[in-house]
Amino acid sequence: MTWNQALSDFNLYLKIERGLSQNTIASYSFDIDKLISYLDTNNITSSPIHITHLTIQQFIYQISKGMNPRSQSRIISGLRSFFSYLVFEDYRPDNPIDLIESPRIGRKLPDTLSLIDIDRIINAIDLTKEYNQVRIGERDRTMLETLYGCGLRVSELVNLKISDLFFDEGFINVTGKGDKQRFVPISSTTQKYINIYIRDVRSAIDVQKEYNDTLFLNNRGKQLTRAMIFTIIKKLAAEINLNKTISPHTFRHSFATHLLENGADLRAIQMMLGHESITTTEIYVHLDKKQLKKAIQTYHPRK
């Protein structure tokens, strides 16, 4: 079995059997491609069936120079999944990654924005800005209001459809990881901006046929990419001299943190974020020590 054949079969397994998104599959492939390139560069002819843990360990050592433990751990995890698949399919008897120790990593707390910073970023958008007669400033404001107002992942934002909007009921239908769907409440404020965008901006775009139902479009009538959203946010952060590195995911983290600070139930936040496990959502508890202290002072019988 060649590396390309093994990788192709693995990607198909991830898509069909595990129902993973294309972005997640691409992340797995990226790390395995690095291993393949390493073997080619060093004239190592080991196949995926016969490669040893020593060769893989040398590869990890080579690419890990200057890499933080979390990134190293992610690569090892991806390779472990790949070789576990080969073992599962009886292509090889063992998983060589089992003999490689992952670096110890702490649980990184996500960066968040204050409400003031979020307002500063959104207010920095030039609402008069046009490109090919498309008011992209209005569009950008609506996207950021939706990111923060609904706690969406960037992939969920760019894939949002007009048919996913159920404003009369106060919800939107979000397609998350693994094509799993969930209903997320949407505030009247976010609804207002989306309605303005659809009425005044999207209606003026010459929409490509395959994107008739896609909510957020570029000036050519096509779906926005995740990279474009990252670029928009980076530019706005630079304009206001924000002293932290942010991404679209920062708005999602801020959404969850602000809900928790204002008394929302952790399981409700879990459902809105689309986390399968409550332990993933529990990371936000660690962000708000004041809230935890207040809970003890307010509710514990021994004040």
Regions found by a protein language model. Give the residues of each.
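Conserved catalytic core of the tyrosine transesterase superfamily
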Residues: 1-303
